[in-house]
Curated annotation (Swiss-Prot):
PANTHER family: 50S RIBOSOMAL PROTEIN L15, LARGE RIBOSOMAL SUBUNIT PROTEIN UL15M. Belongs to the universal ribosomal protein uL15 family. It comes from the Bacteria. Keywords: Ribonucleoprotein, Ribosomal protein, RNA-binding, rRNA-binding. The keyword DNA repair does not apply. SUPFAM superfamilies: Ribosomal proteins L15p and L18e. Residues 1-45 are annotated as: Disordered. This is Large ribosomal subunit protein uL15. PROSITE patterns: RIBOSOMAL_L15. One of its GO terms (cellular component) is cytosolic large ribosomal subunit. InterPro entries: Ribosomal_uL15, Ribosomal_uL15/eL18, Ribosomal_uL15/eL18_sf, Ribosomal_uL15_bac-type, Ribosomal_uL15_CS. Binds to the 23S rRNA.
């Protein structure tokens, strides 16, 4: 006889109903498996409680400062990256940088001045550092803040 899907049954004893405690003397009533007296019988002890020892969250130092919720994060592209990705020069837009895999789409882009630039490029980005501005204009290129 071949075994089919509708012949399968769970192993005997593997599917038992949850025991409801504290529902009568005959079925785990009264103390309901908690033993007699003491804190654990009367109420729950917090998971973080370490038995009176100074807890870990109080032993560790506090972190200084805060995280500014309104900070604008920029993806960084260096002048050296533009030189490497666009060796023939031309228009460098955010869409072109996304297509080349230099930045992720739908995020702000800032051009920084690390490296050298020898080709003439027209760069469009959200922000530029002062050194990047100098290097792009020195190479004969132009800057467009979007």
């Amino acid at each position: 006889m071949t075994i089919k899907l509708h012949h399968l049954r769970p192993a005997p004893g593997s599917k038992t109903e949850r025991t409801r405690v504290g529902r009568g003397e005959g079925s785990k009533g009264k103390t309901a498996g908690r033993g007699t007296k003491g804190t654990k019988a009367r109420k729950n002890v917090p998971v973080t409680f370490e038995g009176g020892q100074m807890p870990i969250h109080m032993r560790l130092p506090k972190l200084k400062g805060f995280k500014n919720r309104f900070r604008t994060e920029y993806q960084v592209v260096n002048v050296a990256d533009i030189e490497r990705l666009f060796p023939e020069g031309g228009d460098v837009t955010i869409e072109a940088l996304v297509a080349k895999g230099a930045v992720r789409k739908n995020e702000l882009v800032k051009v920084l001045g690390n490296g050298d630039l020898k080709v003439k490029v027209s760069v469009s980005a959200n922000k530029f550092s002062d050194s990047a501005r100098e290097k792009i204009t020195a190479a004969g290129g132009s800057i467009n803040e979007v």
